[in-house]
Swiss-Prot record:
It comes from Lactobacillus acidophilus (strain ATCC 700396 / NCK56 / N2 / NCFM). Keywords: Cytoplasm, Hydrolase, Manganese, Metal-binding. InterPro entries: DDH_dom (IPR001667), DHH_sf (IPR038763), DHHA2 (IPR004097), DHHA2_dom_sf (IPR038222), Mn-dep_inorganic_PyrPase (IPR022934), Oligoribo/pAp-PDE_c-di-AMP_PDE (IPR051319). Its EC number is 3.6.1.1. It catalyses: diphosphate + H2O = 2 phosphate + H(+). One of its GO terms (molecular function) is inorganic diphosphate phosphatase activity. It comes from the Bacteria. Its cofactor is Mn(2+). Its main location: cytoplasm. This is Probable manganese-dependent inorganic pyrophosphatase. HAMAP family: PPase_C.
Length: 311
């Protein structure tokens, strides 16, 4: 059987990398020939999780077609978030927990999407449905993915399925998920050794909203005031990225993982900024606004932005 790649989105987070590893393992057990790869280097949080459970980081690819004819996608479906030559390969499987947008295929495929907090929660279900034992390492990296995406089960995206998966996977992995989870999340909050250009690209996704190219980036911190001391430099980096990549609006969500509050920085035209203000019913003050309780790009940012841009 010809090999297929399994990968998550660009600027991969712990879900994108961890779930690719787990889903590749599952598919190989089901008779496929797959390799988990990544569309970027792991961030500090993901690197912490990989090291904890004894994984090497998946190799990074820029294109898929030179090596494979078919691919499996996890944690994304929108082509602008995928590998650069996604139009040159056949997508045979998708497992995701996001909206479906701009996605179509020439052939039938396996597509599974559920409104849960993390893609690994769906893959955990698939292991159980197929009666395939989850190894300790795989359980650990899936647990890490769910903790990451749900902010230790505190995000509004968290479902009972996520909670059940965390309990089960922590038992297999042999860790206290609360202690491990907090340590892992904190490992991803050190922003002092990174430039503003790096930080706004670490966890960023592009969305097509009614003809507008909107970029939404997020960084997690434990000291929000300290992060905001770099506000001017962040805005400058966001302006440059917008000019270089034709973004109509760039939003940076800076989230305090300890109290689940965020501050947003926004650059764009007067029109796109007005859409932002309409989405959150708040006025920007010098390109900045407080967003109490907002921690999820998927559930609390993209839906209101979509509504505002489409109004």
């Amino acid at each position: 059987m010809e090999k297929e790649f399994v990968f998550g989105h660009q600027n991969p987070d712990t879900d994108a990398i961890g779930t690719a590893i787990a889903f590749s393992y599952l598919q190989n057990k089901l008779g496929y020939n797959t390799e988990a790869v990544a569309l970027g280097e792991p961030n500090d949080e993901t690197a912490y999780a990989l090291k904890k459970f004894g994984f090497e980081a998946p190799r990074v690819i820029k294109e898929a077609a030179p090596e494979v004819d078919s691919v499996m996608l996890v944690d994304h479906n929108e082509p602008q978030q995928s590998v650069s030559d996604i139009d040159k390969v056949k997508v045979t499987h998708v497992v995701d927990h996001h909206r479906i947008m701009n996605f179509n295929t020439a052939d039938p495929l396996y597509y599974r999407a559920e409104p849960v907090g993390c893609t690994s929660t769906i893959v955990w279900k698939m292991f159980n449905e197929n009666d395939i034992e989850i190894p300790e390492k795989i359980a650990g990296i899936m647990l890490s993915a769910i903790i990451s995406d749900t902010l230790l089960l505190k995000s509004p995206t968290t479902t009972d399925d996520d909670k059940e998966a965390v309990e089960a996977l922590a038992k297999i992995a042999g860790v206290d998920y609360k202690d491990y989870g907090l340590a892992m999340l904190k490992a991803g909050t050190n922003i002092n050794d990174k430039s503003e250009e790096e930080l706004i690209d670490l966890d960023a996704k592009s969305f097509e909203l009614n003809g507008h190219n909107v970029r939404v980036a997020q960084i997690n911190v434990v000291d929000l005031p300290e992060a905001l001391e770099r506000k001017d430099a962040f805005l400058k980096a966001m302006e440059k990225a917008s000019n270089d990549n034709d973004y109509d609006m760039f939003m940076l969500l800076i989230t305090n993982i300890l109290d689940s509050d965020s501050e947003a920085l926004v650059v764009g035209s007067d029109e796109t900024k007005s859409f932002f203000e309409k989405a959150f019913d708040k006025k920007l003050d010098d390109s900045e606004v407080k967003l109490p309780g907002v921690v999820s790009r998927k559930k609390q940012v993209v839906p209101p932005l979509t509504d505002a841009f489409n109004a």
